[in-house]
Structures are given as C-alpha cells and as structure tokens.
C-alpha cells in the first residue's frame, strides 16, 4: 500500500509550523499506524533529514501517549482504539492522510506532533489521593460494593488521559477527563471521604489551566478511544454542585 502523508512540522513551541508532504510506499495492511511513521522516519534519517517527532510509549492502548489528529479525527477513523492500535488497512491504498497534533490551548505544541499534556497531570494532582489505613491489611469483603457501582467505577477508570476529549471539543473542554477521574472514585466508598474536596479542586484547576466550558455536544464521547460516556459528566456536575452547596 502507498500513501501520501501531510504532516504538521514545527521546530518548537515558538516557531511557526506548516504541513509538509511525504510519500511512503510498500506499506503492509497489517502495519500499525505508528510503525508506518517509524518507516517514514527511517527513510528521512537515511536521507539526512529531520525525523518526525511524535509521542508513543506502550503501543498497546494503555498509556495514552499517542496523541494524533488523523484526517480530522482524534486517533484516526477507527472507533474505540488509540492511534497505536490502528492499522493501515483502515485507509484506502493511494489515499492522502493528514496528521497533526492535538489542537487545544491547554496542550501547547513542543515539536512537530508532540504536545505538552502536563495540564492533565496538574488536574490529577489537584484531585489528590484517597484516605487509607496504613498500619494493617484490610479484611476481605469488609467493604461490600454493589456490582453495578463497581462496573461504573471501572468504566470511568478506563480513561488513559490521552487528551482526545479536550482536543476534539470545540470549546477545548476537559470535562470528560475530569468527570472520569471523579466518577471512578465517587462510586466507591473509599472515594467518598474526600469526594467534595476532590470535585471542587479538579474543576477549579481545569478552569485555571485554560480549558473551555462543556456545552454537551458529545464530541468527546464519540472520539474517546475508551468509549467513556458523557453520563459521567452529569455525575461530576452533581458532585460539584453538592460540594458547593455545603460551603
């Protein structure tokens, strides 16, 4: 398979970027998208050109590092997968593929396709941890949790923090990310102790870092590689309002 790649190139955060066109040939349909970029970079290095910088780590859809807008979609045209889990068979032979970094004011470009997603780390730090007893091992089944609650918590905890929600949202909102983190603990008794403080702190930090407001367009849910529901945003709103009423 042969492809024409239009890739965003930007030397650093202060430089002006532009799209550059590259050709890749004889790509197997079973090649992953990131492997295809590896092949391109090998060719560029052999030609004495600067390779394309892009984020990656586990390449198993777990770490959330791969953060590419591909043909206008976060993580590409495939549903419920991250960029590293997508294969070239999803594209037509001879087609043009446009690749660019996340477009969000809170995710400034570092170089080429690499963005700084440290804002998500700051939101997580604002949320803090849960209280646990450190002097003994808890007894098994001492805290019963309904299966429905455990399932909802695990669904929310599937978030890998890739940033697709904020990058896709027309307002640049990180509400789905924050909601997933808050909801994963709000459904468990262990997370209730600091629940009010956590909701207020994470929302405040999100606003402070320049993320936009949620207007419920649902784009984040549609592009989320872990298919996290916007129902968690409703839970975040409820947790936040309840916490503010207690002030």
Can you describe what each PLM-predicted range is?
Residues 1-22:
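Eukaryote-biased recognition of intrinsically disordered, low-complexity regulatory segments
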Residues 20-32:
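Short, contiguous acidic and Ser/Thr-rich linear segments
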Residues 53-65:
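Short, structured protein-protein interaction patches enriched in aromatics and acidic/basic residues
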Residues 62, 68-70, 220:
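Functionalized membrane-embedded alpha-helices
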Residues 70-94, 99:
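Glycine-rich phosphate/adenylate-binding loop and adjacent beta-alpha elements
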